[in-house]
Amino acid sequence: MPAAIDKDENIQKEGKRIELVKDSPKQFAASGAAAVSAQPNSDKLADVSPLHAERTVAQAQEASVSSFNEEEVIHDLQHYLPSQAPLKDFIHHNTLHAFQNYPFHEGTRRAKKIFGYFPSLQLREYRDLYEAGRIRKDILERVISEQKGAQHLEDWMQRLLEKEYDDSVSPRIGKLRANWKRHYPIDLDLMVHPLLFRILCSYLDQGISIWGFPIGHKGFLAALKEMEEKSFASFFKTKRAKKLLVSGNCKMADLLKLLVGDETLYAQYLFDQQFAHPGWSGMVASVEAQPASLLNPKNITVHDLVVFELLLEIDALDSYFGESWEPIAHILEERPEPLFADVPETEVDTVFSLWHDAFEWTYYDQVLTGIALQDKTWERKIENRSFQTYFCIDDRLTSFRRYLEQLDPDCETFTTAGFFNVELYYQPENGKFYTKCCPAPVFPKFLVKEIGNKQKIKKEVHFSKLTHSLFQGWFISQTIGFVSALRLALNVFKPGSMPAGASSYTHVDKNATLTIENKDPNDKENGLQIGFTIDEMVQRVQGVLTSTGLNGVDKTFAPIVYMIGHGASSVNNPHYTAYDCGACGGRPGSVNARTFCYMANHPKVREALKERGIIIPPTTQFLPGLHDTTRDEVAFFDEEILSEENAGKHRRNTLVINEALDLHAKERSRRLVSIDTKMSPKEIHEEIRRRSVSLFEPRPELNHATNAVSIIGRRSITENLFLDRRASTSTYDYRTDPEGKFLTMSMGPIALVMGGIDLEYFFSRTDNHKMGAGTKLPHNVMGLIGVANGADGDLRTGLPSQMIEIHDPVRLLVIIEHYPDVALKVIKSQTANYSFYENYWVHCLALHPDTGELWLYKDGSFSKIYKPLLNDLETVSDLSALMERAKKAESIETLDAVQENLPVYFIEKKERVKK
């Protein structure tokens, strides 16, 4: 996930860019036909008055002054291109981050009209949802009345429900460059892209190819130039393009003069060109911005990519027409509309925004009704805590917490960002590279190294490089190859683990030690401090414990406090890092959990914490664990540190945890068509495990599909609500943090991590063709950096359809339990993330701790009290029965998928008896 956009910087840059593109049409219009030919036509000037001719010549001369700013255009391209990192660092982010400096509906409208994205459901789908009751009439009427006035309610209801609209998209992007095909009988993309993509893939390859790219240590363009000079074969079919590259006379402006001919069209042409393959262009931009994202470093820039593609286009045209073809400006019949000209709101845009707001608030209203009707004074009282667990804020873990509390009423659960406030780089033993284990925008100063890894790396003979050689490859295919085919067939009926699988448990060896403590600040490696000093440990442990209200005074410690990170296992899944912990940079949370527990168990850290008002009893021990969310299994680390008494308690706690995992697997199974939810929890859990290692299962788990809400507050707010695993929760106790100091820490990952997750699912769901990756079935892994359809396709960005089919595209609703003025101060202090709230890319409410009022963020402040329209929610007493009778989606049509999501329920409060 990229760092959040700096609003002021982007507005300034946007302003410069808009000024450029708005000036260009003026120059074009002023010079008339001269702008097309780039030279004033004196014969035509003779037909006009002397005054007009003088003015026209002056304007033509003004237009001849260069209006093309190469650096500015490249910068703009980098801003608007997809910012998806290579597969090993795939982390969710706002797909339309480039428009985040606009209010949500305006930004999505611009993205739709400029780039052809479809950022909402179809009009037919909204109307179907309304007919099915999934968009409530009272909510729709409230939305219309608030935005258009109550006096216009009937008129707008008629428009939304009955009027026919043309909701097709005719984007501005590509219209200039489309004139090649319109004027000449050629498909320039078809002639250029296959070769371009293969060269890019070969150059950026991270380990698939047996032969590395020749001269790969040089920059992209420099390497191509040297290869062209020293090779018998050529990248080009004609002499001119080759000569331009080899001679070094390939300045971008000169090449554009040959291809375009009019400087005022250069920028638009480059946008058309690069957005014909946004996947590869975006990958190049991402690698240029973060070279360390490639383990096999490559020096490539968007500038070099553009120059080489321009050369290939010149070569393609020369091969077809010789050198007699005209620049595109000379063959224009009609000048295209400037790409970034203003995008006025039309009636159909308003209709879409009203429908979508009503769709969102129909769900939000249920959640807020549940919160508003809660007993504000109720909080579960626990006299003798059996154990306490910390989980990540991840929405997939909310039901796991619920089952733990149901099975053991004396346990207590907390949530915090899954990196547990310890930002670090991690280096496995014998590893060449550092792995960042913290949110993507954070750049740690600390390095934790693994020592004593005794894991044996599984090997597979079919992965041998010999399989690619002529004779050995033939021999292996004719012998071991048959065994491989049999194993593949067997996997259909009896899935099992294999070396090709990705398992979160291999992230760190269970028996290895970590260099967590730093006793000498000068102990550094590559500028990174190895381990943490005592003071640094104290700060991080205090932050987590204080923000969650666990300080040993107001709330006492249990004998064992589990810090459980999360990861995932999968087979044949290129997007595997998207299933791991986003707060850990797309890595499992095991290293962070072990690091935090070491800190919290350190005697000197506890002494310092005691001076700060946090009293941890000597009998309390912190124990790290890792939850595999695909298999629903938990593994523990460092169990040998437990005292004899706590070891016995840990064994009893493990029984509770395993039973909770069985129940959790049953709840998950209601969305998995291949599993009968009426089976016993243990039988279902076994089926879940088999799915996780099946080569033929495109949906081993549904990851964050259906996520919609993020709640920052005490557990009592949500403990008696059934939210269908759609809410991420961050434990925060305002009573221990009246000024909001630690709320800032809790809010840090909300917009960036959870908001990014929500928005990527949102846009991959509404337009899976352009903003998503399409179906997984034709995907090929390209160079270990991305996936493409077939061998010569563009890289696919966003999420595959199998991850988003059941997702409701709604913005994240953030609910903060604190006084509105404190909540406002905190979100405004986070300048890097504030645009999420300011421009409504996420919704935000403050839950007043004293009155229970829900204050909605609007126009820069929490100035409006939201009053839910529902008076009550249905109460459910048996969740297992609810899961068994819940409807499974019959198709991936929006109406079917949405109806699979259960409404919000109250969970009947029962007298809990510990088993």
UniProtKB/Swiss-Prot annotation:
GO terms for cellular component: plasma membrane. One of its GO terms (molecular function) is zinc ion binding. It is found in: Cell inner membrane. Its cofactor is Zn(2+). It comes from the Bacteria. It is a peripheral membrane protein. Zn(2+) binds at residues 392, 394, 566, 581. InterPro entries: DabA. Keywords: Cell inner membrane, Cell membrane, Membrane, Metal-binding, Transport, Zinc. Coiled coil: none annotated. Pfam families: DabA. Forms a complex with DabB. Belongs to the inorganic carbon transporter (TC 9.A.2) DabA family. Part of an energy-coupled inorganic carbon pump. This is Probable inorganic carbon transporter subunit DabA. The gene is dabA.
